């Protein structure tokens, strides 16, 4: 038996992203997390980005698609869609929300998911789009092929989370 230590692939650079119909997603955060985790760009290890400040709970599995990059091309697409010229890419991999009816208890995992749509978002004048996907073979969500087919409340919950999770209660939204 070979018990030697094997190197862990960097989740952003060292893992195949899959195909447009079935992506691999590296999950950083699950709905029960009270801390926002993020992959350290240099080491590839999951690290604490910040404690969740308020009672917002991420409404799905959340992470990124390996080997993607929200930079110049994403900024161009966002500028075109919003009729703007000043949006930049955020320099991170493309974010993904993976819907599942199962309770996944921790992040730092890879899942296979079917993209069904997305949300175009800005964060401090940077493109911060979110791909919305469903977990492969999920008993409830795998029947959905388009974000427009989802129950409206699920889409509203996603939009609400991403438009309010950085807000400070009692202060005007920036």
Give the predicted meaning of each segment.
Residues 1-174:
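Hydrophobic N-terminal alpha-helices or hydrophobic patches in metabolic proteins across all domains
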